[in-house]
Amino acid sequence: MNTLYLGSGSPRRMEILTQLGYRVVKLPAGIDETVKAGETPAPYVQRMAEEKNQAALTLFCETNGAMPDFPLITADTCVFSDGIILGKPRSQAEAIEFLNRLSGKQHTVLTAVCIHYRGKTSSRVQTNRVVFKPLSSEEISAYVQSGEPMEKAGAYAVQGIGGIFIQSIEGSFSGIMGLPVYETVSMLQDLGYRPPLSALKP
């Protein structure tokens, strides 16, 4: 079974990679996720994914005294609406604010993936568009009380209860979850790491 290092504590990213047939070893490393002044969404998520990768790589080398034998994957997701980058809500009040902002409108979900393997590093940004139905204050309150919006970019989970708010998606469902499958496997192949199923060849 193919092995990957995942520089993330996200259970959703772990689930996606495991479902693809990889054996996943968690290697999360924390970084400062503050948005820089004037930073736009795509450069921001790409910088986050790359900085997470470097932090996880440094942690691995310090712990093991060598570079990892298998690919190290990191990713970052953000939601962009009305010119504002929405990360993970820091409180229930902020989650309510985010959901009110998304209600009845289209927003953009960007996920950046960064992979290091055998001395080479590759990163890519994948973009999706999501349309929310208009949300009532009662729906928002009940959803926030469920706890699901916390620790989720934009304060919702497309694969969870939050999916009932979504009218349409343009892009990748897995990308909105936090790790776009097509792009991730393509990047691994480009770096010389084959997917679990040998039938998946270019």
Curated annotation (Swiss-Prot):
Catalytic reactions of this protein: dTTP + H2O = dTMP + diphosphate + H(+); UTP + H2O = UMP + diphosphate + H(+)
InterPro entries noted in UniProt: ITPase-like_fam, Maf-like
Subcellular location: Cytoplasm
Pfam families in the record: Maf (PF02545)
Ubl conjugation keyword on record: no
Coiled-coil stretches noted in the UniProt entry, renumbered to this chain: none
Main location: cytoplasm
Keyword presence, Cytoplasm: yes
Molecular function in Gene Ontology: dTTP diphosphatase activity; UTP diphosphatase activity
Alphabetized SUPFAM superfamilies for the sequence: ITPase-like
Site (Important for substrate specificity) location in chain: R12, T77, Q159
EC category: hydrolase
UniProt family annotation: Belongs to the Maf family. YhdE subfamily.
HAMAP family, A to Z: Maf
UniProt function note: Nucleoside triphosphate pyrophosphatase that hydrolyzes dTTP and UTP. May have a dual role in cell division arrest and in preventing the incorporation of modified nucleotides into cellular nucleic acids.
Full protein name: dTTP/UTP pyrophosphatase
Species, as recorded: Neisseria gonorrhoeae (strain ATCC 700825 / FA 1090)
